[in-house]
């Protein structure tokens, strides 16, 4: 079984090096209720996407030799599901983060190509959502500590800059670590 550390690093790299989904992360960090709501929503949406795309890959694309359509299928389903769920739920914030579908696309695409079976893909998705929850909580704690402190503007900015540098260093380390774990070839996958 593939180690569960790379999905967590991949989430970190997407957030803090590429900027994908960073506005969603900041919105989720506004309050504990928003953090939990967005994490559960993200877990549910991703579970649907991974299961649906896994079935499409193995029972539609592979038999018809259309595996090259996988990125288009993942992108279309992530965009549609994210847009529909955003129109249905308006809790926690009225501002809809536009990059949520990009974050969904990147994570689902990475997991469907890395995992060897559906169970492993869903476990990796759970680990990614735990990373989402952890980073939201850390951002909320940093924001509260900085805004409630009695320091000057320079001291508050320095603390935020230091925290951001730590996140970026962790994401770059995670991106380098990802190259150590080979992605299995399409023909070496196991069936459901």
UniProtKB/Swiss-Prot annotation:
Q: Which domain of life is it from?
A: Bacteria
Residue spans crossing the bilayer: 5-22, 42-61, 66-88, 101-118, 122-139, 159-181
Q: Where in the cell is it found?
A: Cell membrane
* UniProt keyword Membrane present: yes
Chief site of localization:
membrane
* Entry GO CC: plasma membrane
The name under which this protein is listed is Uncharacterized protein TP_0148
User: Which organism does this record belong to?
Assistant: Treponema pallidum (strain Nichols)
